[in-house]
């Protein structure tokens, strides 16, 4: 199992032909360095494909995902610094749901 303590959304569009080295270069340029057990998400310009880059402390993992239909709910405005994601936001994002509206802690206390 790959341990991921923190997830970061890199909002600038990325060419999905990019491999782990190019993605790592982008992470280093925007954040100053890749941290162990942190995951960095990238999407293409149309937000139809995403890649996840994870530094596990020993090396780098790179995973890709695309939806059969539709696109990922990706921010329209690119920011200089990556955005932090919670686990529930990440879970919603990778299945194509609008993750931006999810609260930090989603707890139902009354019915």
What do the PLM-derived regions correspond to, one by one?
Residues 1-111:
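Polybasic/polar functional segments that serve as interface/processing modules
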């Amino acid at each position: 199992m790959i341990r991921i303590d923190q997830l970061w959304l890199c909002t600038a569009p990325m060419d999905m032909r990019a491999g782990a080295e190019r993605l790592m270069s982008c992470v280093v340029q925007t954040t100053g360095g890749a941290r162990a057990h942190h995951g960095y998400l990238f999407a293409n310009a149309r937000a139809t494909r995403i890649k996840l880059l994870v530094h596990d402390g020993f090396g780098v993992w790179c995973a890709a995902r695309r939806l059969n239909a539709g696109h990922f709910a990706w921010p329209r405005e690119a920011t200089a610094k990556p955005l932090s994601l919670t686990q529930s936001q990440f879970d919603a994002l990778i299945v194509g749901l609008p993750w931006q509206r999810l609260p930090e802690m989603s707890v139902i206390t009354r019915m």
